[in-house]
Amino acid sequence: FFDYETIKQTYGYSFELKKVEKLSDISDFDGTTVLVSQSEKVEVNTLKLKIDFFINIYKKLGSVLIVNGKQNEHYISEIQHVRRRETIAMTPANCHTALQALIKNSTFTISSPEIELNKKIVRDEIITITGAQTMPLIGSSGLSMQYAIMMGLVDFAQENYQGKPIKFIVPPNCYGGTNDQARRVAACIKNVEVIDLPVDRENDMTHSIDVILNEIAIQDAVPFIIAEIPTNPRVEVPDLKQLKTVLEKKRKTTLNSNTINPVFVLDQTFCPNTPFLDSVELFSKVKAISYVSGSKFPSGGQCTAGYCVGNEKTSSLMLKIDKHLNICDNQATDLQYEILAKQLPSMNQRIFDAYQNTRDFVDFITKNLPSAKINFVSKELANQGFTPSVFSLDLPTKGSTTKEKENYKRALNLKLINLMIKKIPNESKFCVSYGQLKGSYWTVPATSTQGTTKEGDKDYIVRVSISPKINLAQHKKVFLEFSANI
């Protein structure tokens, strides 16, 4: 269960490995000692001073990490951030099982008699929805899925393009977890770097990708693009024919040799119903991978599991991604499969219903507050299959200076959100959720999803997501009250 060579070579960790039968076999070491063990019994562990960290892995449950000694307390916040980004906390259901076993000082059992059936339902549904040509991979969360993708791509590049620099091309203002994790991976691994991909406001994704790929060609580097379509938070869709042309474009190095073709990794959490990989025309000549956060539409917010698929050209890449999903023990749990098997069959209908509600609400806001700038897909794009249920709202502002205008707008953002929550407490929530079964979700990206984004790239606008089940008349009534008092 411990892939020694990959963890050293791909992840860049430096360590010595020693197998011990009992704690007394652990010798003094001038460094950090990590004890890794597997157990079927959850119990209190008494650690020797020689052990700095104790990782106990419980099959099908997760793992428990004990930090030993005051001298190691300063690592805890960093460990928690890794758990938040590169992996995931033990699921609530598994935590309950672990606590029960701990209280009883006993072994535990996780019974999932229909797990194979649930796995088949989930995989078949994903293939039908995405039109993918590879077997879907299902992870414990969207971020753990992205981590497996990134580490799988790094592993592939190290094996096939030895010594060449690896470039992850990522929008600087995209969803906080995506952005933060990509930069953390680059900071931890030699020869890996993140390149900013401007996609919003006055920038065009296709043009930005073209410029960056031309620059990377000169360096003879390995390009991996991570992008969201539609973009987040401004919900913009690039010209897909132009994007196809840019991705397929033949480029030369300074020595006039062919460059390494890019891999296009698409986060399509906003529109998981759009079959990007099913199109013979769109990405047929490009290595394309798509992934989705399961905490949104796939499960309706009932679990965090995410999934990943690829087109025919990515079969070798998908093997690497699967390898790293297993190394990190980040596969979906049995309960997550059960939830996805129940919710995925209705996903496309829920997406359609949520889009209809969102379009209705956006049209209402446009009519009653025309001075507000709304970012949402056009009806033409919706007819092409882009039907998100999220929009961004740039409210009108006042003031004689730029600072006064910005401060007024930021206060207005909060005034609107707080009014919605106060007037419709059973439906309106102040959080970043999307694709939930019911309700509306309001946030300011700059102070939520973009927590680790550079200040200049943050978006101080209102982001709103609408669900398929919502009291739209009440939402319109409250918004009218807000707009009348601006």
What are these regions (language model features)?
Residues 14, 45, 56, 68, ...:
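Detector for Asparagine
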Residues 3, 7, 111, 117, ...:
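Active-site C-terminal subdomain of aminotransferase-like
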Residues 125, 129, 135-366:
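Conserved PLP-enzyme active-site core in the AAT-like
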Residues 227, 266, 393, 464-466:
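Conserved beta-strand positions
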Residues 132-136, 400-403:
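Short, surface-exposed acidic
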Residues 1-120, 124-133, 146, 156-168, ...:
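PLP-dependent enzyme catalytic core of the Aspartate aminotransferase-like
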